[in-house]
């Protein structure tokens, strides 16, 4: 008998994933399922697969698999959607929950109106590492490497529309300085504490948004004196607000979480 697996497709600022409650629907070989289901013509279509599970360290756990089957350390947009999922599907009544991820325990604050989660604030912790990167003659810009539990390469440019992201994104993702590959962000200051950003995600390619990438971009902007400690990051799929708390050193990310549809696939 064929097993049916129920899923929910959700997105955070356009960064869309397939969500499965593995306490009800265990998934074998999630790497393969992520590849199969993420295909737009023959699968569901998404940036990847996120598994929600139990944890002995937190209220819930989250595992993230990119569209190419690789497992990610963290997904900021995905964590917001997990918060919406567990609240609206009755897995918790709490409006502040903890989430066990490969990059540590994250604290989520749910903004609820009329029984629905309208936004989620995620305490992303402190940036783990920052470093200037100079490519010499190979690329005509300087970048900043920022780790938010996963690696990011942030580059500020005068005109983001002039960046050929499909061409340069994979070159930088796989550049020899980054043996584990890297996420790639290009950003432009468009107003006071307002930044336009586009992303090439490691393992997924161009996506509509990247939460950890938005955090990394805000960190780089502060370090270079381009923005204050609280700013809006405008991405292709939507906007998130990032605050780098001076007192704690933590990054707070606030943004939307949206359900697209429910469905079921063969296991």
From Swiss-Prot:
Q: Which residues bind substrate?
A: 15, 66, 76-77, 150, 183, 201-202, 211-212
Q: Which residues cross the membrane?
A: none
Question: Which InterPro entries does the protein's record reference?
Answer: DAP_epimerase_AS, DAP_epimerase_DapF
Pathway connected to this protein: Amino-acid biosynthesis; L-lysine biosynthesis via DAP pathway; DL-2,6-diaminopimelate from LL-2,6-diaminopimelate: step 1/1
Where is the catalytic site?
75, 210
- Reactions it catalyzes: (2S,6S)-2,6-diaminopimelate = meso-2,6-diaminopimelate
Gene Ontology terms for molecular function? diaminopimelate epimerase activity
Q: What is its main location?
A: cytoplasm
Per the UniProt entry, what is one GO biological process? Answer: lysine biosynthetic process via diaminopimelate
Tell me which domain of life the UniProt entry assigns to the organism this sequence originates from: Bacteria
Where is this chain's protein located in or outside the cell?
Cytoplasm
Q: Which UniProt keywords apply?
A: Amino-acid biosynthesis, Cytoplasm, Isomerase, Lysine biosynthesis
Marked site: Could be important to modulate the pK values of the two catalytic cysteine residues: 152, 201
- Show the Gene3D superfamilies listed in the entry: Diaminopimelate Epimerase, Chain A, domain 1
Might you give the EC number(s) for this enzyme? 5.1.1.7
- Cross-referenced SUPFAM superfamilies: Diaminopimelate epimerase-like
**PANTHER family (alphabetical):** DIAMINOPIMELATE EPIMERASE (PTHR31689:SF0), DIAMINOPIMELATE EPIMERASE, CHLOROPLASTIC (PTHR31689)
Entry function? Catalyzes the stereoinversion of LL-2,6-diaminopimelate (L,L-DAP) to meso-diaminopimelate (meso-DAP), a precursor of L-lysine and an essential component of the bacterial peptidoglycan.
Q: Which HAMAP family does the record associate with it? A: DAP_epimerase
- Quote the subunit structure annotation: Homodimer.
Q: What is this protein called?
A: Diaminopimelate epimerase
